[in-house]
Amino acid sequence: MTNTTLDYYNNHAQEYAQTTNRADMSENYSRFLKFVKEGGSIVDIGCGGGRDLKYFKDHGYEATGLDASKELCVIASKYSGCPVTCSDFLSWEPNCKFDAFWANASLLHLTEKDIIRFFSTKTAFLNNGGIFYFSMKTGIQEGNDDNGRFFTPFSEALLQKILKTLPSCKIVDRWYSSDRLDRKDTHWESVILRV
């Protein structure tokens, strides 16, 4: 994650959490959780303000957060009541394995090379048959937005590169959706993998 991206989230953490915590993620939750065992362990990668962590915890899952923004880590932990690790995604080295990863609108802040590196190294921390959900913006250009946040767009080519690094994984669900915060020109591709 670039310094300007991290600076944005640290400097706008409260505002960002308040805005994103009101998004209706019910369809995404439903599609994801049908693949996760009841009470299973989930890591929310890029947990932001803690919206998804809180939902998972409130529905009986063992939820843990991960975020690179120190300010968002504090907010997410307080809001959700879940443990949150503050770490760069690529530096994260947990001491156990998990049933599922949830990376909603977070990996897109990495370069394509680092996204592929994340998949090739961090899926080792999923239990056998583990589930990996991720979503990324479509139809955008790679680079910084007006706020200095770096984005990598979703593409079919990127997905194929991810799959090539994980030859035994399978796509179990995939869908295209409009923005949950009603931003008119923003669309998302969501993918669920069984690793």
What are these regions (language model features)?
Residues A105-H109:
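Short catalytic micro-motifs in class I SAM-dependent methyltransferases
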Residues W102:
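A conserved beta-strand element that flanks and buttresses the S-adenosyl-L-methionine
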Residues L110-T111, L126-N127:
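Helix-to-beta-strand junctions that scaffold the AdoMet/dcAdoMet cofactor pocket
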Residues M1-C96, K113-R117, T121, I131-V195:
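Class I (Rossmann-like) S-adenosyl-L-methionine-dependent methyltransferase catalytic domain
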Residues D99:
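Conserved acidic residues
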